[in-house]
Amino acid sequence: MAKVHLIGNAHIDPVWLWRWQEGFSEIRATFRSALDRMKEFPEFKFTSACASYYQWIEKMDPEMFAEIKERVKQGRWSIVGGWFLQPDCNIPCGESFARHGLLSQRYFQEKFGVTAKTGYNVDSFGHNAGLPQILKKSGMDNYVFMRPSVEEQGREEEVFYWESADGSRVKAYRIPELYNIDAGRLSLIGEIKSRADQKDIDMMAFYGVGNHGGGPTIRLLDQMGKLKVPDLVYSVPDQYFAGLEGKELPVLKGELQHHARGCYSACSFVKTSNRKCESHLLAAEKFAMMARHLTGIRYPKKKLEKAWKNVLFNQFHDIMGGCSIRPAYEDAGYLYGETMSIAEQEINYALQSIASRIDTLQGEALPSYKEGTHWHSWEHEALGTPVVVFNPHPWETQMSVNLNEVPVKMTDWEGKEIPFQIIRGDQTNGNQDKYHTLFRAEVGAMGYAVYRMFFRKEAGAEERKEESGVLAAETNRLSVTEHQMENDLIRVEFDSVTGDVCRIYDKKAGRDILRGACRALLLDETRCDTWAHNQEYLGKECGYFTVPEFQILERGPVRAVVRITTTCHASTLQRDFILEEGSSGVLVKVKADFHEKHKTLKFAFPAAEKTTTAAIAFGTIVRENLGGEEPCGAWIASGPLAIANDGKYGYDTTEGEVRLTILRGAVYADHYGDRDLYSEYMDQGVHECSYLLYGYTDAADAEKRAQELNFPLRHVMESFHGGALEEKESCFFCESDHIAVTAVKLSEDGEEAVVRFFETEGRSGKVTMELFGKRIETTAAHNEIKTLKADGTEVNLLEW
């Protein structure tokens, strides 16, 4: 007869319908209760995940922490999960999942002498297809989840092998019924026993008061001891999975979806902040490693770890899913603010450290101040004013750089004159100081390059021409009208009715990458709650942004900008369409003044074919276009069109269109409740975002473009000095075209660099790279995540 393993637990949401301070209290009280029950019920065992909870207890109550350590040693307290908490399992990037394991498993090993063997995300709203490999390379062979249910996923398997694209497998258990069986629902244990007998396989039943903590109570344990159900055993997940060894199990490949499709896009603030913080921390790590290599400056490990923990905490599924109360997002904002402050400080320290050691004098004497010298830039008659442009990306990058200066000439590191463009700045400091300069920089992989500005002393505001709001340039290599913009690579046309792109022609490929006019539209989602429970679609179309106003903002040798403003109901949409010289994509900067309740803003692109490729953690997934709302990462592609975004995670496909979800006017934490005067609506007011439209070639290229969109080049205005560094440097080189590098950081155990990448095209091949002067030769299996030290030694995601 099949056994039922009784798993004592307490599902604890540190944030949901309460703030984290209350969550802290519930964790403390629940852990105390579990320890007390162990004294009263010798057979009772307790299972708990989430490294952040243990860290709170360690800091707040060392005596309780010592008790937990002893119970872990006895085998009565089981540590599962191996992550900082139970995150949303669709939205975080691959590196976030890697840091969940890195920071948590090492903590468990240090404090308890064990690591989690079982992944544990019982309440997360879906699970991306890359998780089996991530789990395996984080030291976990098993996985416990509950959502989606058998009915939601349309699959009957509850115990199975879950396999990712590279072939990695974990044993997975889908919790039947509930993760928090309490005294009033003990009959469910009998039902689970019947199901286990019917399927002839052992199963688990999870008992204990949950959501707001609590765990197994005296009453519950007393009643469980009186159950007349045979073959029950007090257990922990590791014990259960050990009993499955050698058994034949079905194999499920791909993602585990769908539950609560509205969570891919609810609360735009938390989604955008997550992407911004992830991108900045990854850039800070790369810049810090560059500075360490070039200047010897110390790598800020502890500060970056603190910042990563902030990001990981905010990835908790009820926070990141957008379904918590409004004050919870104020708290999330505080963590994001601290994270961005740390990231920006460390980026600045790294860049200043490098810039200060570059030989900007080039053998010339130090300049002396002369009357008429530019008032807020260092200036040298022969050398101009140096600008050091930095690239954190591990590939050569060409992007525009915006300077708060107006020179008359610019040169690159070789002294070659380069084009630049005077544009209107964002300041109005009198008539003299309201302009900026834009130029297109080319910087090597994880490198820098010095550019120089030269000023004409007699230049004044009267020499700048401004006609009809358009800043005139000396040359005009880009063609732009109100309804069309063009460079040597693409031509972009606008629809006079919708005020949106209606054609993008790829000159190099000789193809159109759109099949008609794009649209900005509203969906009526009155029937949805915040989660969009039991809804495949967010709603039906109920409004369209039209009556466009066209305005050419910029034309010049570097870029052209057309601003198009449209309205719908009470909302206004302002979009700047930007085409740069040398770019094969059109960048769109959006400012939406959104005042819609129970409505969703979507941007629709007519390019969908039978499938859509979407970025997921450390990889991609190809989905059939079935119409429903789906999760995505930093880019999606269907047919010839690719769309990169800077913080949007949901899309759908319908009637030949891919529709990116931008904003949702849902009620905070509304589970089909009363919608009255007390209801507070999310995403109201002004929101900004960006997206990039371009021709799709392959996943490796798409990853690069998305990373560049989310973190552009940085620059430092420099002075004059000698130094050991040249005016151009690159710290990375890679010959392989089918990998995406996601991280370059300092190893956890030593002083070596660590580089991580994943294979993008589903084909094995050689990988040759050079990192900080050290050559690395290895191979990448299809869809493999690989972590290497600079000497070529392979380690897992825990760097073991």
Where are these regions (language model features)?
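N-terminal catalytic cores of secreted or lumenal carbohydrate-active enzymes
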Residues: 1-99, 108-110, 137-140, 252-256, ...
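C-terminal domain-boundary segment and adjacent tail
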Residues: 8, 46-55, 60, 136, ...
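Surface-exposed loop and adjacent secondary-structure segments within mature catalytic domains
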Residues: 67-74, 95, 128-180
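Alpha-helical scaffold elements lining the catalytic groove of polysaccharide deacetylases
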Residues: 89-107, 176-195, 560
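CE4/NodB-like, metal-dependent polysaccharide N-deacetylase domain
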Residues: 97-130, 134-137, 190-204
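C-terminal (or distal) subdomains of carbohydrate-active enzymes
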Residues: 131-134, 156-158, 183-193, 217, ...
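Alpha-amylase-like alpha-glycosidases and glucanotransferases acting on alpha-linked glucans and related
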Residues: 158-205, 209
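Metal- or metallocofactor-binding catalytic centers and their adjacent structured scaffolds
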Residues: 246-364, 383, 415, 707-716
